[in-house]
């Protein structure tokens, strides 16, 4: 006789309830969080503007059906597109992530919480334009900053103790979950509707990390977050219609996320949701490089200057040794052919070789015309990594959150340079005072890529005046970015 199926519908999983209660009820009071969110907004938009320089990104942008213009549609920064919020979220999200130059969160799971700005900004602009058309008040940029802080917190707090990469899943699933929650709240959904929306995000089949690792590394890693944040807007809009949710999306035996995708394990949590993640997020300021390599690139730049002072060049190098942390080795320690820019910006040997050869590392250095220089692969072959357990421990320490790398150069004449150690990149919370002026410079450079001088100045006047920016309607701010 077969066992009967228990068809009593459970309460929503506690993990889902905690997310929803946080987005609905938690008041952000941290000045540091808002200060950081302000600069995060500017940096993230700037990253999107730089991506417009690359045809591989631009070809994916615009409406699904060419020529479609949506009434009261979202303005995509740096373009003339006017899109529905779902497709706009994809456009903005793909731009943001394309060059791997936006913010980073490193823990048991890695990720880029500002990826959520795709869904947040698209939803806020769409709501604002429709509100104005109906004679109602638009959303303000302060509401965008609040949504950013909360999306960062959801994605980052889940990532602290839970490794999705170890089960082959891509971190963009956390973008989908975080964006769904904050977008649903922005749309004015009820608590029950937001619970439904978040459960729908967990029930989705989640992206695999296939496209982030050899031998399949490819450009999907540059648009995967855009795909996730746009899916979030879609799910939130579905929930707004009254579409049902799935209370035990995580915990259902056999069919829930834990049993299907997480080896039967439940999530662990280090801290309740607050504003910790935005306060401690990492900015990529100096180099468009996968974050586990940022300090290695900084060390390589220092060594390049030392080589110049000593009258040496990369041709004189016999051996390069990188002392690093475990996550770096697992993600970007790569030998063999590199097939495309996405492959190259996830290879620490490539990202160290370029500054040792040329004294720079820019997004253009991942392109084919640079990579064909035979000296790069020759130097890559001389670069080896090994794990320092102390670096790994500091990486996981919540009070340190170091991303340390140390490089030693040995030369063909038998000499060597003293090891250069960099524990914290310039985008780290411990180096905010050094980093923020450079972050603003990065934003100015990216504005200059797309806009004439007068338009750049109009954007800067508002963007750098925090009080004025916070009060500005979202639609008016995005209008500044239309070409």
Curated annotation (Swiss-Prot):
Keyword Lyase tagged: yes
Presence of the UniProt keyword Lyase in the record: yes
One GO term (biological process): propionate metabolic process, methylcitrate cycle
The reaction(s) this protein catalyses: (2S,3S)-2-methylcitrate = 2-methyl-cis-aconitate + H2O; citrate = D-threo-isocitrate
SUPFAM superfamilies, alphabetized: 2-methylcitrate dehydratase PrpD
One Gene Ontology MF term: aconitate hydratase activity
Inducers of expression: By propionate, but not acetate or glucose. Expression of prpBCDE operon is regulated by PrpR, CRP and a variety of sugars such as arabinose, galactose, glucose mannose and xylose.
Classification via Pfam families: MmgE_PrpD_C, MmgE_PrpD_N
Involved pathway(s): Organic acid metabolism; propanoate degradation; Carbohydrate metabolism; tricarboxylic acid cycle; isocitrate from oxaloacetate: step 2/2
Phenotype upon loss of function: Cells lacking this gene abolished the residual aconitase activity of an AcnAB-null strain.
Record-listed E.C. numbers: 4.2.1.79, 4.2.1.3
Keywords (A to Z) from UniProt: Lyase, Tricarboxylic acid cycle
Enzyme class: lyase
Domain of life: Bacteria
Miscellaneous section: PrpD catalyzes an unusual syn elimination, whereas the addition of water by AcnB to cis-2-methylaconitate occurs in the usual anti manner.
Assembly behavior: Monomer.
Function comment: Involved in the catabolism of short chain fatty acids (SCFA) via the tricarboxylic acid (TCA)(acetyl degradation route) and via the 2-methylcitrate cycle I (propionate degradation route). Catalyzes the dehydration of 2-methylcitrate (2-MC) to yield the cis isomer of 2-methyl-aconitate. It is also able to catalyze the dehydration of citrate and the hydration of cis-aconitate at a lower rate. Due to its broad substrate specificity, it seems to be responsible for the residual aconitase activity of the acnAB-null mutant.
Family indicated by similarity: Belongs to the PrpD family.
Protein name: 2-methylcitrate dehydratase
UniProt source species: Escherichia coli (strain K12)
